[in-house]
Amino acid sequence: MEFFNILQSACNDVNLDFNDKKYNQLISYKNLIQEWNKKINLTAIVEDDEIIKKHFIDCIKIFKSSPIGEAKSLIDIGTGAGFPGIPIKILKEDIEITLLDSLQKRINFLNIVIGELQLKNIQCLHGRAEDYAQEIQHRQKYDIAVSRAVANLAVLSEFCIPFVEKGGYFIAMKGPSVEEEITAATKSIEILGGKIEDIIKIDIEDTDLKHNLVIIKKVKETGKRYPRKPGIIKKNPLK
C-alpha cells in the first residue's frame, strides 16, 4: 500500500486519475525492469523504492505540462527502458504512443512489456531518430515528441522537433542546470521551427532529484534538410 499511496499522491498533484489497474501495471513494469536488467543494461536504478520515485514519479511529473493532457499522439525519442513513454501510456490510456530506440535488445524488452501489460495503441521502432524523422509516416505527424535521453538540448532538438506537427510540442526532460543549454540551443530551436514556451521546475519528493521540463512549441514547419545525416548532429550541433 505504501507504493500505491506514493503514486496516487503524485497523480493527484497533476490531476490524474489513479486506480488499481494502473498501479498493478506499473508494478508489473517495475518487476520486468528488474528481471530484464540482469540480462541487458536498462537502468542503474534497480531498487523498488528508487524505481518508483526516480523513474515512475519523475515520469508522472511530465503531466505538469498542459500539452500532454491534451495530446492524442506522442513519440518518445531514445526511450531506453520505456521512460517516459510507457508510464504515460499507463496513466493516459487514450493516447497513441510510439517508442523509438536504437538498440534492438531494448526494443525486445519493450515489446515484452507491452504484451505483458496488455497495452493498446503503442508501437516500438528500432533505429535512428535522424532516419525515421525523414519518413513521411513519422515526419511532422505527432502532437508531442518527448525525450529523457542524455544529450544537450541543441542535439535533442534536431532529433525531436522534426517529428512534431506545427502547433505541437517537444518536451525535453532535463537536469537541474539547464540555463546554459537553453542559451546555447535557442538559435537551433528557432532554425528547426520551434520556440521555447515554458520551463517547469520539477522536484521529486524524498529524493535529491531536481529536474526541468523544457516546453518547446512548434511554430513553423521544419526545413527539409533537417534532421541532418546520422553522425553529423552530435559532431556539429546547430548554432
UniProtKB/Swiss-Prot annotation:
Major subcellular location class: cytoplasm
UniProt organism field: Clostridium botulinum (strain Langeland / NCTC 10281 / Type F)
EC main group: transferase
GO molecular function, one term: rRNA (guanine-N7-)-methyltransferase activity
Function, in words: Specifically methylates the N7 position of a guanine in 16S rRNA.
Assigned EC number: 2.1.1.-
Name this protein carries in UniProt: Ribosomal RNA small subunit methyltransferase G
Keywords: Cytoplasm, Methyltransferase, rRNA processing, S-adenosyl-L-methionine, Transferase
UniProt record similarity statement: Belongs to the methyltransferase superfamily. RNA methyltransferase RsmG family.
InterPro entries, per the entry: rRNA_ssu_MeTfrase_G, SAM-dependent_MTases_sf
Pfam hit, one: GidB
Subcellular location: Cytoplasm
Superkingdom field: Bacteria
Gene3D superfamilies (alphabetical): Vaccinia Virus protein VP39
Taxonomic lineage: Bacteria, Bacillati, Bacillota, Clostridia, Eubacteriales
